[in-house]
Amino acid sequence: MEAVPEKKKKVATVPGTLKKKVPAGPKTLKKKVPAVPETLKKKRRNFAELKVKRLRKKFALKTLRKARRKLIYEKAKHYHKEYRQMYRTEIRMARMARKAGNFYVPAEPKLAFVIRIRGINGVSPKVRKVLQLLRLRQIFNGTFVKLNKASINMLRIVEPYIAWGYPNLKSVNELIYKRGYGKINKKRIALTDNSLIARSLGKFGIICMEDLIHEIYTVGKRFKEANNFLWPFKLSSPRGGMKKKTTHFVEGGDAGNREDQINRLIRRMN
């Protein structure tokens, strides 16, 4: 037999009485977790700002480099014109003097290039000191010297130990471009970039290699700073060797003043 389900008993309510409502507990609001965390948003924002700053800086540097390249080109062009004008003036003056039946005497040279050709074993302290002042501490070291009364007297003191003369534009150009090293933070640094020169000599208006060559060759107002910036040139032993180091050049040796013939020696040693 099937079981008969029991019927629920109805509870009779007395009229006038109300059912008591059970108070509901406090509602808990669920926090929505953002799809992207705030820290990640902040990182992205900072990265975007940094990227914009980098791009602006890169663009500014590119513009500056472009302007500097243009300035260097204009300077090189101007210097080339100036050198040609100097050369043509010399030729014209010599022709005019020859035409008038006179002799043209060129201006006294302002620049000398000095090369040490001998050691200093057994020499006097005075000679040793002068060689140190000329920054000729090793054999076949070379430096540019501004010619005046004091420097000529110094060269006479150490004349048996040096070969010197008056370099032309080609020699100055080749020496600085091929053997040029700068003194940067008391270190010998190869001049491979104009920015190295601009960093050290920019305050004197020398920002590129052409400025440096022009200042040295013309013995300008900032010759001292430009020459001190250049590390003494380390030249090679001359091709074909030396004739006689202990004898003066006018007697068939190598020492002393050889005037314009120093350019031939520079070609052999550079």
UniProtKB/Swiss-Prot annotation:
GO biological process terms on file: cytoplasmic translation; maturation of LSU-rRNA from tricistronic rRNA transcript (SSU-rRNA, 5.8S rRNA, LSU-rRNA); translation; translation at postsynapse; translation at presynapse
Entry keyword Lipoprotein: no
GO CC annotation, single: synapse
Modified residues (N-acetylmethionine): 1
Keywords: Acetylation, Cytoplasm, Phosphoprotein, Repeat, Ribonucleoprotein, Ribosomal protein, RNA-binding
Record-linked InterPro entries: Ribo_uL30_ferredoxin-like_sf, Ribosomal_uL30, Ribosomal_uL30_CS, Ribosomal_uL30_euk, Ribosomal_uL30_euk_arc, Ribosomal_uL30_ferredoxin-like, Ribosomal_uL30_N_euk
Sequence repeat spans: 7-18, 19-29, 30-40, 41-52, 53-64, 65-76
Family annotation (Pfam families): Ribosomal_L30, Ribosomal_L30_N
CDD domains: Ribosomal_L7_archeal_euk (cd01657)
UniProt modified residues of type Phosphothreonine: 39
GO molecular function annotations of the record: DNA binding; identical protein binding; mRNA binding; structural constituent of ribosome
Main location group: cytoplasm
Subcellular location: Cytoplasm
Source organism, top-level taxon: Eukaryota
Family according to the record: Belongs to the universal ribosomal protein uL30 family.
Subunit structure: Component of the large ribosomal subunit. Homodimer. Interacts with DHX33.
NCBIfam families hit by this protein: uL30_euk
Functional description taken from the UniProt entry: Component of the large ribosomal subunit. The ribosome is a large ribonucleoprotein complex responsible for the synthesis of proteins in the cell. Binds to G-rich structures in 28S rRNA and in mRNAs. Plays a regulatory role in the translation apparatus; inhibits cell-free translation of mRNAs.
The protein's name in its UniProt record: Large ribosomal subunit protein uL30
Organism: Mus musculus (Mouse)
Gene: Rpl7
